[in-house]
Swiss-Prot record:
Reactions catalysed according to its record: dUTP + H2O = dUMP + diphosphate + H(+)
Lineage, opening ranks: Bacteria, Pseudomonadati, Pseudomonadota, Betaproteobacteria, Burkholderiales
Protein name from the UniProt record: Deoxyuridine 5'-triphosphate nucleotidohydrolase
Entry-linked InterPro entries: dUTPase, dUTPase-like, dUTPase-like_sf, dUTPase_trimeric
Cofactor(s) recorded in Swiss-Prot or TrEMBL: Mg(2+)
GO molecular function: dUTP diphosphatase activity; magnesium ion binding
Signal peptide: none
Naturally occurring in which organism (per UniProt): Ralstonia pickettii (strain 12J)
Recorded metabolic or biological pathway in which this protein acts: Pyrimidine metabolism; dUMP biosynthesis; dUMP from dCTP (dUTP route): step 2/2
Cited HAMAP family: dUTPase_bact
């Protein structure tokens, strides 16, 4: 798949988003901030990535996901938990960054902050019914299938 990318921050020309390994599912997104940014515990910041994408094909969407090390080691996660980028969106990708930790975190310019994953999408056609055919699970939820 080819992905149309518009570079909005010239610094990205030297550090284009890339897959870290051949098995990586996500492209690393960088923090296009001009100076180190201190993210205090409990606060959120909207961080520009310096790029825009256009998927164009309604059969795809993009997800902005946290990098595992940022959340586990530093408490830095996404303020919206997952960012959903629709196929027709063409604006700059922004990362809602939340410090859920107990200490301040300094985000440096061009630091890898999140990852972008392209996923297939199926748009469902709603079929209104009065009843469902019975299934083994039925309406059981929230732990109804057991713990182990």
């Amino acid at each position: 798949m080819k992905l149309d990318v518009k570079i909005l921050d010239a610094r990205l020309h030297e550090q284009l988003p890339q897959y870290a390994t051949t098995g990586s599912a996500g492209l690393d997104l960088r923090a296009c901030v001009d100076a180190p940014l201190t993210i205090e515990p409990g606060t959120t910041h909207l961080i520009p990535t310096g790029m825009a994408i256009h998927l164009a094909d309604p059969g795809y969407a993009a997800l902005i996901l946290p990098r595992s090390g940022m959340g586990h080691k530093h408490g830095i996660v996404l303020g919206n938990l997952v960012g959903l980028i629709d196929s027709d969106y063409q604006g700059q990708l922004m990362v809602s960054t939340w410090n859920r930790g107990s200490t301040a975190f300094v985000l440096n310019p061009m630091e890898r902050l999140a990852q972008l994953v392209i996923v297939p999408v199926v748009q469902a056609e709603l079929n209104i019914v009065d009843d469902f055919a019975e299934s083994e699970r039925g309406a059981g939820g929230f732990g109804s299938t057991g713990r182990h």
